[in-house]
Design a protein with these regions (language model features):
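N-terminal cationic and glycine-rich segments that engage phosphates or anionic surfaces
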Residues: 1-102, 269
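A residue-level signal for conserved active-site and pocket-lining positions in enzyme catalytic cores
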Residues: 3, 40, 115, 181, ...
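Alpha-helix N-cap recognition
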Residues: 28, 129, 194-196
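Generic recognition of flexible, low-complexity loop/linker segments
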Residues: 31-32, 42, 108-109, 173-175, ...
């Protein structure tokens, strides 16, 4: 969904912790170059937590390393961003569109029926944005290849998602803005109100503890890119639970919070 291309290594199948493993993540393209991973390399692999296979050692590096230069989903030329290869075709790359939509529904957590297969079917039919999905009717879903019953359920789920209370930080993180996961979304909204995010600056975010310069720049760019969609979704009146600002929390917990203060005596200037 962010455009980052994650290389996956095809290895000779080996049994690890009772499972047959034939694919291992290389994490990012920079890792492939640095470790010289390629055909003929010999590596040591383990299942992290007995679930995810990962490389623990390169016993023998490859004599030749091949790095792809085009996105397998849309064919766009890939660009380097630090150690990552990025597909810059954010608005039209099918893989990015599908993963972005799936991320929203998965993060929201209160909308059933919008898994990867359903999202793929919708995108193929041209219903490829949150705006289009939430504006779709049962008939639109049927024209996209869903049956009458499933189409009705999809529409009901969308309606239900508007009425179920959801934390505003979770809602924000669901849009898949780079560098803005759930924890950072909560931290951001503890310092800046949601409706002020459209005009937030890099400097304002840097001033918040935990945000570095590059991260802040990415967040500002991501908010700008996604704001039209965020604004549309806010207009649907989702039932958002507002994050309390740290300043408000400080005032509420102040020793003199709720007390009335009265001054007596004369004032040298103006009246009481």
């Amino acid at each position: 969904r962010t455009g980052r291309v994650t290389p996956v290594l095809e290895i000779e199948p080996i049994e690890l912790s009772g499972a047959l493993v034939g694919r291992v993540t290389a994490h990012h393209a920079g890792n492939v170059k640095a470790l010289r991973l390629g055909k003929g390399a010999i590596i040591a692999v383990e299942r992290s937590g007995e679930v995810i296979p990962k490389i623990v050692e390169v016993i023998k590096p490859a004599t030749r390393t091949i790095i792809v230069n085009k996105c397998e989903s849309c064919g766009y030329e890939l660009t380097w961003q630090r150690d990552f290869l990025i597909c810059p075709n954010h608005s039209e790359c099918p893989a990015q569109i599908e993963n972005t939509l799936e991320h929203f529904f998965k993060t929201h957590g209160q909308v059933d029926g919008f898994g990867s297969k359903s999202i793929e079917k919708l995108v193929t039919a041209g219903i490829d944005t949150l705006e289009k999905i939430y504006n779709s009717t049962e008939e639109d879903f049927q024209r996209s290849g869903f049956g009458p019953g499933q189409s009705k359920n999809l529409r009901l789920e969308l309606n239900r998602s508007l009425k179920v209370e959801i934390e505003d930080w979770r809602f924000l993180s669901a849009f898949g803005i780079p560098q803005l996961g759930q924890g950072d979304s909560r931290r951001l909204l503890q310092n800046i109100q949601f409706d002020e995010l459209s005009k937030v600056t890099k400097e304002e975010i840097i001033a918040i503890e935990g945000f570095a310069e590059i991260t802040s720049a990415d967040i500002v760019a991501g908010l700008k890119n996604k704001w039209s969609t965020i604004k549309y979704m806010l207009g649907l009146d989702f039932k958002l639970s507002k994050t309390q600002l740290l300043l408000e929390s400080t005032l509420i917990n102040s020793p003199i919070s709720g007390m009335k203060v009265v001054f007596t005596g004369k004032m040298l200037q103006s009246s009481r």
